[in-house]
Amino acid sequence: MAPMECVRRRNVGELVLRCAATLVCMLSLMLLVRDQQIAVQEVGVTSVTTQLRYSSSTGLVYLVYANGLVALYCFVVVLTSSFNGGSVMRRNKSGAWALFVLDQVLACILLSAASAASEIAFLVEKGAKKTIWDSKCIVYGHFCRMLEVSIATSFIAVIMLGSICVLSAKQLFQQYTHYARIVNMVKLKSTPNSLL
C-alpha cells in the first residue's frame, strides 16, 4: 500500500472516530439532562415530594459540561478538517501540536468528569453507612438506571478519545521522523565520495 494511501486511510479513520465521539458525548449529555424523577416519600404523617435531576449534584453538572465541551471540540475539528481535504489540521507542526495537546486535555477532563459521576452514582446506589445516608435508588430507580447508562457512554467516549490521542500523537511525531529522514539524506549527499 502506498504511503499516501495509508495517510488518507488514517485521516478518514480519525475523522470517523471523532464523529463517533461527538455522537456518543451528545448521547451521554442528552441522557443526563433529560434524566429526572419526582418521588413522593412518606415522612411521619405527611408526604414530601422530592425531585432528583442532574443539577442536584455538581459532579453531574461537571459531566454535562465536559460532554458538551468534548462534543463541540470534536465537531469543530471534524468540520474544519472536512474543509481542509480530510487532513485534521496537520499541515504544520503547530497545528499538529495544538490537536495533540487539546486531545490529551479534553480526554483527561472527560475522564475526571466520568469518574466523579461514577462516585456519585455509587453513593446514590449504595448509600454511605458512616454518614447515615441511605440508598436513593430504591426511590429513584429510573434516575439511577439512566445515570448509569449516561456514565457508561461517557466512558465509551473516553476510550474513543484515548484512541484519538494515540492517532494524533502518531501523526505529530511522524512529522519529526520525516524531518529527520530529510536531514539524514542531506547529510549523506554532502559527504565526500572519497569515504566510499
From Swiss-Prot:
The lineage of its organism: Eukaryota, Viridiplantae, Streptophyta, Embryophyta, Tracheophyta. Residues 1-11, 80-95, 170-196 are cytoplasmic. The keyword Transport does not apply. It is a multi-pass membrane protein. Residues 33-58, 117-148 are extracellular. It is found in: Cell membrane. Belongs to the Casparian strip membrane proteins (CASP) family. NCBIfam families: A_tha_TIGR01569 (TIGR01569). The chain crosses the membrane at residues 12-32, 59-79, 96-116, 149-169. It holds the Pfam family CASP_dom. It comes from Pteridium aquilinum subsp. aquilinum. It comes from the Eukaryota. This is CASP-like protein 2U1. Its main location: membrane.
